[in-house]
Amino acid sequence: MAETIKIKLVKSKIGTLPKQRQNLEALGLKKIGQVVEQKDNPQIRGMIDKVSHLVQVIE
């Protein structure tokens, strides 16, 4: 596995559940098209799984 992973927000968080919005905030994603770099670990992967319909993983 790589040390870091890039995550891009591709869909709006409007209409999502509060837990999903909290996951996006924890990942550091606020605006559509924003790309953040996070450590590649099981915790981050779990957050990505919860909002997989809103984000795109760039490896």
Swiss-Prot record:
Please list the GO terms describing molecular function: structural constituent of ribosome
Q: Is Ribonucleoprotein there in the keyword field?
A: yes
Any one Gene Ontology cellular component term annotated for this protein: cytosolic large ribosomal subunit
Instruction: State the source organism's domain of life.
Output: Bacteria
The biological processes this protein is annotated with in GO are: translation
Q: SUPFAM superfamilies this protein is in?
A: Ribosomal protein L30p/L7e (SSF55129)
The record's InterPro entries line, in alphabetical order, gives: Ribo_uL30_ferredoxin-like_sf, Ribosomal_uL30_bac-type, Ribosomal_uL30_ferredoxin-like
Q: Which UniProt keywords apply?
A: Ribonucleoprotein, Ribosomal protein
- Stored NCBIfam families: rpmD_bact (TIGR01308)
In the record, the note on similarity to other proteins reads: Belongs to the universal ribosomal protein uL30 family.
Binding partners and assembly: Part of the 50S ribosomal subunit.
Please report the name of this protein according to its UniProt entry. Answer: Large ribosomal subunit protein uL30
Q: Which organism does this record belong to? A: Alkaliphilus metalliredigens (strain QYMF)
